[in-house]
Design a protein with these regions (language model features):
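Active-site-proximal beta-strand/loop segments in catalytic clefts of secreted hydrolases
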Residues: 49-52, 81-86, 112-115, 183-187
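Serine-esterase "nucleophile elbow" of acetyl-processing enzymes
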Residues: 21-82, 95-104
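Structural motif
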Residues: 86-96
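Hydrophobic h-region of N-terminal signal peptides that target proteins for export
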Residues: 11-20
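Amphipathic coiled-coil/heptad-repeat helices and related helical stalk/stem segments
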Residues: 31-32, 63, 91, 164, ...
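Generic structural signal for helix capping and beta-alpha/helix-loop junctions
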Residues: 56, 88, 189-190
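Bacterial N-terminal signal peptides that target proteins for export
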Residues: 1-7
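Alpha-helical cap/lid subdomain in secreted, periplasmic
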Residues: 73, 94-223
Length: 223
């Protein structure tokens, strides 16, 4: 099951290549044949931020990770910072480490996080808080201060959406001109890692009454 999930994940990330159909092929280091185009990520340097799904130390060489497949298919150089068990509140730390060690040489960043937020029953929360403020405005008359409601992003590690707000803000500040790809949590099957770590499949709610769908939809709203 896990192997199939990894393969599906990698295929989805590489879908721009697949969508070109039969007239499109991955070009190697040799010149492309007429009618073929090179995948835009071919030969690029990509940072991976995540949890056990990307952690190079998790399961060793027994299970290939998504970045292994992309390295093979697209000759990508992977900079992997995923750590097993981490949640969205670890994104800033991993991003800082990526920036420190590779700076501007990274071409794109992939974030695959969220399944542990669900499993740990982190409340989904809301994106914004509203408050009344005065703002200068004019609509065909002399400008003046008006009182209007304003929405402000909630920056808190107490909720899932608050963590995403913090993580994305951090990534944009560190890598303002880089492509950032957010991937949703994968489907969850029953996972038993011992007497004190048994995770039911996705047909069950977590302890705060949410299905994994809510965590998937939250990330989809960021796109």
């Amino acid at each position: 099951m896990k192997n199939r999930q990894f393969i599906v994940f990698a295929l989805l990330l590489a879908c721009p290549l697949l969508l070109h159909g039969q007239e499109t092929s991955l070009c190697g280091k040799e010149s492309c044949n007429k009618g073929y185009i090179r995948h835009p990520w071919y030969g690029k340097k990509v940072g991976y931020i995540g949890d056990s799904i990307t952690d190079p130390n998790c399961y060793g060489d027994n299970i290939k990770k998504c970045w292994d497949f992309l390295k093979e298919w697209l000759d990508i150089t992977p900079y992997v910072y995923g750590v097993s068990g981490r949640q969205w509140n670890d994104v800033p730390r991993q991003a800082e480490q990526l920036k420190k060690e590779h700076g501007e040489e990274v071409d794109a960043i992939v974030v695959l996080m969220g399944t542990n937020d669900f499993n740990s029953s982190v409340p989904v929360g809301t994106w914004f808080a509203e408050k009344e403020e005065q703002v200068m405005a004019a609509r065909g008359e002399t400008k003046k201060l008006e009182t209007r409601k304003r929405r402000v992003p909630i920056m808190t590690n107490d909720t899932y959406k608050g963590r995403i707000n913090i993580g994305l803000s951090h990534l944009k500040k560190l890598f303002p001109d880089k492509q950032i790809v957010l991937l949703t949590p994968l489907h969850r099957s029953l996972a038993e890692f011992g007497e004190k770590n048994v995770q039911p499949d996705e047909s069950y709610q977590n302890k705060c009454g949410e299905y994994v769908d809510a965590y998937v939809q939250a990330l989809m709203a960021c796109t």
